[in-house]
Amino acid sequence: MLGLKGCLTILIGYVIAVCALFSSRGRNPSLTDWEKLKDQKISNIDNFGLTGQHLLAFFQENLPFLSFSEEKYRHKHVSLYYDVFKEYILRRASSKKCLPVDSAIAKLNKDVNPMPVHSHNDYWRKLPLFEGLAYGASSTEADVWNIDEKILAVGHNEAYLDPVELTLDKLYTGPLLEILDEVNCQDSDSDRKNGVFFNSPETSLFFYIDFKSDDNELTYKLLMEQYFKSLIDSGYLTYYDMKKDEIIWRPVTVILTGNYPTSLDILDNGNDNGYFESSQRFAFLDAPLLSLEPKYSKLSVAATVSFSQLMKHCGSDHWKVSLRGRMDSNEISCAKSIIDGAHALKLKTRIWGAPTWPANLVETISRQIIHDLGSDLLNLDNLFMASSLI
């Protein structure tokens, strides 16, 4: 018969085996598990030590735990996921303590290199602005609608706007100001400003504002005098210096697209020396890639065209490319010459509307756009796929 020592050995071995079984299956903790741990105040931890895609995955997998029994999350603003994530990221941004190494940017994208990707329809993501920054996307986008001549709501369709929670200031300009203040606290008066990428603070985030409303002059006025004013006053927006005839790069570069005003009289508020009479222009036009003129070297920093327009210009058709599964040598040669022309004017380029299905076609065309054509910003909805293609 086995002695007491032998029985204990067998029992311990059994417990270890059971624990290993559950561990190997990757069982997610239940709400009961979280209930036992709620007193540890996990939702008050300032830094989990995760960044980029790992941070996003952690929040998605542990959302019940992170928000459990927190009264402040009972009323959602955007979504439970967004509200909890934003609160974590910006938790210390309002603090008077100046410590950029432990900032929102450090939590979002430390050890994540910026990638030449445009976060297309960024406002549709579960985490507008934050998800793109976590992946390192160096360009983002917001469609804006003028509501009651005083609010810029963000959304793709006018029928589904929320002028209270889903606004330009709550989703984009407000968080950007907090984030940038946090990493520029050590010398806020310096002309040198740190940007939104931890690994590359000198990289400017392209911020496309897509005008949707008919009254684009009023929309532009709201942008300049209300939504971007604090960013301008803090020195965070790239601008064209009218006196020096050069572009001065800053952490955020605003690009107007869609139904935007093109008149310099509107862009400069009727002044010869800029909107605020400071000899600075704080917004750039999304230049038409197929009809560029020398003037765009001062008015723009980027030029755009749709994939279908580009293929038509090159004597082809986007359906032919899709059926073939790739661009042929003639199409590549033609498109590359167009992009080279933009580069001669020191403009970045973006091609939107490329095939979105199937996945192998998307990957092939995307690689050709970046590597064969030499386009600067890969326009994709799927940031995970984009990160694997760059």
From Swiss-Prot:
<comment type="similarity">
    <text>Belongs to the AIM6 family.</text>
</comment>
<feature type="signal peptide">
    <location>
        <begin position="1"/>
        <end position="26"/>
    </location>
</feature>
<dbReference type="GO" id="GO:0006629">
    <property type="term" value="P:lipid metabolic process"/>
</dbReference>
<keyword id="KW-0732">Signal</keyword>
<dbReference type="InterPro" id="IPR039559">
    <property type="entry name" value="AIM6_PI-PLC-like_dom"/>
</dbReference>
<dbReference type="InterPro" id="IPR051236">
    <property type="entry name" value="HAT_RTT109-like"/>
</dbReference>
<dbReference type="InterPro" id="IPR017946">
    <property type="entry name" value="PLC-like_Pdiesterase_TIM-brl"/>
</dbReference>
<protein>
    <recommendedName>
        <fullName>Altered inheritance of mitochondria protein 6</fullName>
    </recommendedName>
</protein>
<dbReference type="GO" id="GO:0008081">
    <property type="term" value="F:phosphoric diester hydrolase activity"/>
</dbReference>
